[in-house]
Amino acid sequence: ARHFIFLEYFIIEQGKMFDPIVDILEQKAKEGVLVRLIYDDVGCIQTLPPKFYLMLQAKGIHCACFNPFRPFLSVIMNNRDHRKITVIDGQIAYTGGFNLADEYINEKMKFGYWKDAGIRLTGDCVWNFTSMFLEMWDYITKSEDDYAFYRNASIPQLGNATRNQWIATEGNTEVEGKNPAATKRMAQRRVEEPHLT
């Protein structure tokens, strides 16, 4: 990675799988790579210590917790972020059913032997994962990223090649309507790239 690394996972657990990843992310942050991580608070409620994001931020890793759990105050507790995404420089994306926890590499047998699927994607389709991550990041942090920077800095143009199709997931989150910038961007994308929705 030379520009950015984005990770978004439902479950993260400190251990043999995640700890070496943190070391790599910390090193990349020291090299000037923008590193961002999103985790779901309920997904990690039994696997991470409270305010884990502060430990990562001390290592130069920008971190956001999706929909923090507030007992007795949260009526939207079931609104969870089940995505499992890694994006590197907008050129490579990983996704699938695996989370960043030892049970996914069978270091811990929580439910017996575990085998999950994952894929590595390259090319123009990676932009879809980049923009999905940025929309979620902007929603959680109430910020507004310059999407053109991430697209133009790292995505090779494919000329007249056919764009990849993807399934919009904003219906699974409560992004639209709560973050005006994200809502505007989603509407703009539907107008500019209707074949993607």
Q: What are these model-derived regions, one by one?
A:
Residues 1-197:
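Charged, low-complexity intrinsically disordered terminal segments
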